Design a protein with these regions (language model features):
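N-terminal intrinsically disordered/low-complexity leader segments
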Residues: 1-9, 191-193
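Solvent-exposed, amphipathic alpha-helical segments
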Residues: 13, 17-24, 71, 75-78, ...
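Amphipathic alpha-helical segments used for helix-helix packing
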Residues: 98-122
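Hydrophobic/aromatic-rich alpha-helical bundle segments in the mid-to-C-terminal region
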Residues: 120-125, 140-193
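Short, solvent-exposed amphipathic helices
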Residues: 123-130, 134
Length: 193
């Protein structure tokens, strides 16, 4: 007989194990057995909760996006000006619990997954639309080149994540400063044209 209340805990353990396993191996070439072992359960139980490795990967992707969305909402709630709100979006992208090595490696792997799996592609599109929308909302109040700046900032954020996943020692404060400085430069240039 199954233990009451264990499913959410076991699902959470599996999601965390997916992120840890991908983060450690830096690859999607992990097995359900590896994930389950890391979570302290059998492969059969992992399959019971998710059905497939792909669904475990999607759940991990959703988890990372959910953490990120929660951080963005908190940052926006505390901001009072358009520039403060933009800074909040940038800060959320590079918060230490979001921009940690295992999650940046997992995130890079999810980009690869999104090329071939419709569910992952959909989640990636939702993330990209939300990021662009959050940037545009306040950029439109600050610059006539809001669309171009939003696209460039989104690409820069993705690029910083890509570089962080490919090398050791990436720091969230340095990444945040890099994107924030770029934003200031873009705003200054766009308002002097």
């Amino acid at each position: 007989m199954p233990k009451v209340g264990m499913e959410p805990k076991r699902r959470a353990a599996l999601v965390s194990a997916v992120i840890d396993e991908i983060g450690e191996t830096r690859s999607l070439d992990v097995t359900v057995a590896q994930i389950a072992r890391r979570a302290g359960m059998s492969s059969g139980l992992a399959h019971h909760y998710f059905g497939s490795k792909e669904q475990m990967l999607i759940a991990a992707m959703r988890h990372i996006l959910s953490e990120f969305s929660t951080k963005v909402r908190a940052e926006l709630r505390d901001a009072s000006t358009p520039r403060d709100r933009l800074e909040g979006v940038i800060r959320a992208n590079f918060a230490p619990h979001v921009f940690d090595p295992r999650k940046t490696s997992a995130w890079l792997s999810f980009y690869a997954l999104a090329q071939s799996k419709p569910d992952a592609a959909h989640l990636m599109q939702v993330y990209q639309r939300r990021l662009r929308s959050n940037l545009l909302f306040d950029l439109r109040k600050l610059s006539p080149q809001a669309d171009e700046i939003a696209d460039t900032l989104a690409a820069l954020i993705d690029g910083v994540y890509l570089r962080a996943a490919l090398r050791e020692g990436a720091r969230s404060d340095a990444a945040h400063l890099q994107v924030s400085t770029a934003l200031d430069t873009f705003l200054k240039q766009s308002n002097t044209r």
